[in-house]
Amino acid sequence: MVDKNIYIIQGEINIVVGAIKRNARWSTHIPLDEERDPLLHSFSNLKEVLNSVTELSEIEPNVFLRPFLEVIRSEDTTGPITGLALTSVNKFLSYALIDPTHEGTAEGMENMADAVTHARFVGTDPASDEVVLMKILQVLRTLLLTPVGTHLTNESVCEIMQSCFRICFEMRLSELLRKSAEHTLVDMVQLLFTRLPQFKEEPKSYVGTNMKKLKMRAGGMSDSSKWKKQKRSPRPPRHTTKVTPGSELPTPNGATLPSNLTGGVPFIDAPTSISSASSEAASTVVSPCTDSGLELSSQTTSKEDLTDLEQAGSPREITTSEPGSSEMGASDQLDPQEGAHVEKAQSASVESIPEVLEECTSPADHSDSASVHDMDYVNPRGVRFTQSSQKEGTALVPYGLPCIRELFRFLISLTNPHDRHNSEVMIHMGLHLLTVALESAPVAQCQTLLGLIKDEMCRHLFQLLSVERLNLYAASLRVCFLLFESMREHLKFQLEMYIKKLMEIITVENPKMPYEMKEMALEAVVQLWRIPSFVTELYINYDCDYYCSNLFEDLTKLLSKNAFPVSGQLYTTHLLSLDALLTVIDSTESHCQAKVLNTLNQQEKKETARPGFEAVDGNPETNKSERATSDGKSTGVALDARGLHFPSGGWLSTEHGKPGCRDLEEAGDSGADKKFTRKPPRFSCLLPDPRELIEIKNKKKLLITGTEQFNQKPKKGIQFLQEKGLLTIPMDNTEVAQWLRENPRLDKKMIGEFVSDRKNMDLLESFVSTFSFQGLRLDEALRLYLEAFRLPGEAPVIHRLLEVFTEHWRSCNGSPFANSDACFALAYAVIMLNTDQHNHNVRKQNAPMTLEEFRKNLKGVNGGKDFEQDILEDMYHAIKNEEIVMPEEQTGLVRENYVWSVLLHRGASPEGVFLRVPPGSYDLDLFTMTWGPTIAALSYVFDKSLEETIIQKAISGFRKCAMISAHYGLSDVFDNLIISLCKFTALSSESIENLPSVFGSNPKAHIAAKTVFHLAHRHGDILREGWKNIMEAMLQLFRAQLLPKAMVEVEDFVDPNGKISLQREETPSNRGESTVLSFVSWLTLSGPEQSSVRGPSTENQEAKRVALDCIKQCDPEKMITESKFLQLESLQELMKALVSVTPDEETYDEEDAAFCLEMLLRIVLENRDRVGCVWQTVRDHLYHLCVQAQDFCFLVERAVVGLLRLAIRLLRREEISGQVLLSLRILLLMKPSVLSRVSHQVAYGLHELLKTNAANIHSGDDWATLFTLLECIGSGVKPPDALQATARADAPDAGAQSDSELPSYHQNDVSLDRGYTSDSEVYTDHGRPGKIHRSATDADMVNSGWLVVGKDDIDNSKPGAGLSRPGPSPLVNQYSLTVGLDLGPHDTKSLLKCVESLSFIVRDAAHITPDNFELCVKTLRIFVEASLNGGCKSQDKRSKSHKYDSKGNRFKKKPKEGSMLRRPRGSNQHATRGGHSDEEEDEGVPASYHTVSLQVSQDLLDLMHTLHTRAASIYSSWAEEQRHLEGGGQKIEADSRTLWAHCWCPLLQGIACLCCDARRQVRMQALTYLQRALLVHDLQKLDALEWESCFNKVLFPLLTKLLENISPADVGGMEETRMRASTLLSKVFLQHLSPLLSLSTFAALWLTILDFMDKYMHAGSSDLLSEAIPESLKNMLLVMDTAEIFHSADARGGGPSALWEITWERIDCFLPHLRDELFKQTVIQDPMPAEPHSQKPLASTHLTSAAGDPRMPGHPPLPEIPSEMGVCDSEKPESTRAPSSSSPGSPMASSPSKLSPAQEGPPPLTQPPLILQPLTSPLQVGVPPMTLPIILNPALIEATSPVPLLATPRPTDPIPTSEVN
């Protein structure tokens, strides 16, 4: 079966042959002889061949292609026929009729490329001709892009490209065709560069020998005069002049170019000629000209005609730096004869495509066309091509790198703006194709291309940045981006120059500079900054390089400055600048996020990988992060309710802690080339740590300063650098020479002066040795040498410099001349020649030296011989053509070339190493440098912009900055950010009344507020200063009533709901105002809606609703609830911010302070787990508010409530409970007047506290505090004076004395035991810094600034306690039922609550402890006294003006703006808060008031009775418990003496006290309780002394009190009470008569009882007592008589005793007949008359001895301990009682026995004994003897007795312990 492809070819043959035959050429009527026409002949041959085969693969591609290609080559065919042939060829390629694997394919492709690129045809009209050209393009495109195209050689590819370029740049062709050519080129370039990675680098030798064939020319149009129209005949004669290789002809522009002259006229001229001018402006490759570089070779259809073409040319590429010459490669020139052979052509001729390369001859022509070298070439498919000569059939080498390099070079040459041949179109085309090339291939991997990029390409691109054509400018920016994106590591200094250029464009103030250029430059910067790691690389490679600009820093400053519009209007440039700044933030933020996630993943992995460390060890990544987290300060990342919390600081990535050079693998493979990255010499390893970079930057600053100083005075500069340690001392010449060579900022003139100095000869030698002169001609070396410094003018200096130079040059080049003198002479001659040739002054005088003269001057200088003439000639021409100059001092191109060559030179040195770093390295350093400018720019843009997107972008920027600062723990950054944002919330600036509407209607403020709160919630950990601003915003929201209800409602003890609002209720206006207003509106006849008091408008209401909604989303409360997650430092700052709103400030507002206080308290409670750390702050603040308050106000009340709330919640925490209870003493330090106003709150608070926490109170001191508080609040007892004195002493800044400063009489350091505090040091004035953050644990309480006052001091302030005492106290009644404290006004409801609290303690046995029992008893007695007569004391002295106001308040606020508009606090709101005002209690509910007071008394009675009955069992259980525990501490005795002293006696006194109440009900109830108590079984254990004490302390004082007219209204009731009391007396006496008889003082006791009988008989007005008393007395006398008490033991016969006499003597005074009634029969003999007076001394002696020596056995003192409380008080831990010596008549408690060893046992009495007066005393005649009841009212005794009963203590005496309370 015949191959279908054969038919396709046959069909194409028929079409082409048919067209040829139809052509006018054959239209004669002569039959065509096909044999004679070569074209038809070859077609007929092909037909025969095709007919003879069945498979197309049986014949070579060349066979079936040749006839078609001959048609294409033929000059005689017309356009349409050529077009048909081209179509056929295209079809063969498209249909893949050519087998790529066939061995003849390569040759076929080569022929095809040659034919199509040299196509000729007879033109018809331009349009038809263009169709043919279009088809040529099509074939060339298909040829290169189909698989068979890979067989093309380098030369063919270059020809193909050149053909396309010609069409593209031929301006006479239509735009469509040109654009098609352009697209074709794009496709071809893309293909070639896409294949680039498949080609391997050619060895240098190969490149050198072959590249000469591949010169594409960026053609050059010469001057118009040079070129003529070429007219050609169809068959011109051939002139081929062979030129030997190597011959050069000078070209018009002075460059010497390798030439190749070929004969032949390849063109048929176009019918329309072009004017010379337009051609010059147009493309460079259309018509021939002498220096256009176009090849003029005659190529006819037969291949053999081409054989006489010869390639020639120098292998060396010569370039010139003059503009215009471009990089013209080897070019050819028209043979001079050529013009003579040009003849007139036919009119039907057409212009053909100008031909391709002058040297690209067909590879089939010559054996040397395929480079002959000894290497085989293997194409990408693995086919090996062996080079051999043509005769053996050369294998054609497929194209590779050489043609790509040539194409690349050509494209670069097109972009040279200084080449006059390059039109704008060409430059643009070049840039476009370079873009395609760079986009398609990793060009940097190819070294041959890299060289071109580094030099010409970058140079042309930078030059294009200065052109004014925006399209070229934009295109060059695009190419630059591609370059630096992919290969910046090879282009360090090029990148520096590029960025500097961009910065210049951005900042230049040139009005001609279009705005768009700046915008594009900025966009280019932004684009670069977005490349990952780019910014970091800028920083590390430039800012951290000694001799580079600080690119990153400068750019950041520039962008920041540029983000601020000068005019106030935001343009794109400003936003672009912001974008650039934000890219740094964005990338850093994303790295931080990644690190956090990575850390979390690591942690998860670690958790799953336990046990064992396989996961950690096996994974280098893990190790790295492990190292990071363990080295840094950070302890990892905690997740909680708020999402992520970032560690506060520390380096978190590889940059932290010096990663050794073991990290190279990680760092090195980031760039395009994965080879080992070179390390810059300035770094210790590939990723230096940040500390090292900072050192380098500091060093760089010093170097710049040193350089500046050197440029003024070299020595000074060197000295400066030596001082700073950058250069060694003494000077190291090598080091300095190196510095002089590598520092580009040094002034060349100064270098010259310094090194040429005679003193620095050694330095000069070192300096010269830094040059490498190997292989350089002397003049070249000299040129290099003299570029490094300015040659001074003096001859000796020049001599020195040249001498050292020539020595070094000789040693580098193996001493080429006879001796050093010859060398020196030649060098000098070169300098002279340079001066002669180029110095204007010299040229004016003499003609410049010729070559001959130069040679002549040097005759015989080379050791007597001549130098080589060629060398001299070369030197002469080099100097003549190019002056040796100091390029830095030149301008224009000379300087530019020099700067560029220096740049290339530096790039090739180790300095040019560009470090690629992994993304995320050095983020912290970069952020530290950029955050300031960025936040400033963000704030500005946020403020000025109205566009939603821009605002969102700014906010996103803020959030990212916050996230980064949180990640790295940068508080200052975060504070700055929060402060900036707070300004935009509009909360700080607005007045309160406008705030809701202004804030509500400002969307930007909403965004800012939400952001502030969101950031504070999320990153509060690192907030410091910023808290103040946030709190200020919160306060504003509070003032404007925009906060959620939960934040303004606070706990309250008294309010029935348990909560009150901190905000005043809205009241329309108070009564007075409204009256006036209504009157005014009535006068003006206006309705209320017209008056000024109008309701808020709907807009305002809507705005307020929006504002409330926004605040709800902000969730400010979260700030408090989540404060428990804050780091301690941040928490302390937050508390500081809240504390700062105190009454000291000028613009203080009470409500604000209360709000801040409440927030502070809530925060403390939220942080109760670590309350110890913040306790000091909050306690100081509360102290300040409570103790400094001069008057009651709402804030004081909130402070008191707050203190109690804290105590209630914190007492459960063991570690802080002691301090918390101690802090409650703050309340005792308050001014009594202020404290009384908050008594309700305190009473309710204490009740709550005891109910919830009684079990957590353990120490006696703490109980003492609580009971003292209960006493002060419940009964108006004044707080202990010791505390008050210290509180007063704490005037602002006075600083009270500490314990150590006070004179102390405490032996044995009792103070350590006291456990109480003064405010002297801790509660310092807040203005004073220093003592705030001390921890105050119990152990350290004494040192922490508390004045520790123990219970003893409070009970018993001794003279040494630092209080001034106003002289001795007046006498006190020793036996009073009352506690004797001066009770101030108190509040019955508070008392009731306190009694409830007491009841709670007493009724629960668990809460009664040895520590609080006596305190409890004492407090009960004080409450009893307070409740007496229905709390009559609470009625006295009560101020009636307690309504809530803060008039006299020290905390008054100054009026501030808008304060008049603050709503007045509603009268119903806080009116009764402080004073629980009397009007309400006294007037409003009198009945309930009395019910309450009655309730109190009954409760107290019940409590006392309960305690009394349970005392014995309680004490015995304690004693038992202590025995089991065998613990130390105070021994607990359960004997009757202890019980009497500590429990029974005081309780009985308390009950007795209530027996004296004015209310009958209470009296009777109390008497019943007393009777029950006295007769209780437990009391039977008491001995005589205790019973005597019972009479003295309980019964006698009771009877005395009842003698007073207690209840005048209830006479009968009083009678009954007195009767019951006297009956009780006699009952008790008789019941315990036996033990009482053992008393030595029995007589006195008995007489006292008789005395009371006497008084009671005469006390009442009714007969009740006068009848009852005699009966009682009779009963007692009879019992005593029966017991033979009246019989004298020693008298003879048991006669009547002295007692009998005294008894009747006393009774006779009031019942004279009783004796007769009772004892008629009984006659007691009188004693001896000689002894009437001896009895008196007896009584006296008894008393005296008893009183004088209390320790006498069997003789307890009658007055015992002279106190109303007796012994029982001596050990009471009543720390809550302060000395009240200043109040006259106040009773004192006895001194504690533990105060000092000397005071054990009862103290000695300090008064003389009482003396019984003789009965015959004249004073007593007819008067009941008042002196007998010595234990009664001493004031009365004193009044009736001639002898003072008590001596007044002398001032020098120590104050009696009995007077100390």
From Swiss-Prot:
Q: Where is this region: Disordered?
A: 210-264, 289-353, 603-634, 1286-1335, 1431-1486, 1727-1812
- Residue ranges, annotated region (Phosphatidylinositol-phosphate binding): 886-1372
- One GO BP annotation of this record: protein localization to endoplasmic reticulum tubular network
Q: Can you say where in the cell this protein is located?
A: Golgi apparatus, cis-Golgi network; Endoplasmic reticulum-Golgi intermediate compartment; Golgi apparatus, trans-Golgi network; Golgi apparatus
Give the SMART domains listed for this entry.
Sec7
Record carries keyword Nucleotide-binding: no
What name is this protein filed under? Golgi-specific brefeldin A-resistance guanine nucleotide exchange factor 1
Please give the organism.
Mus musculus
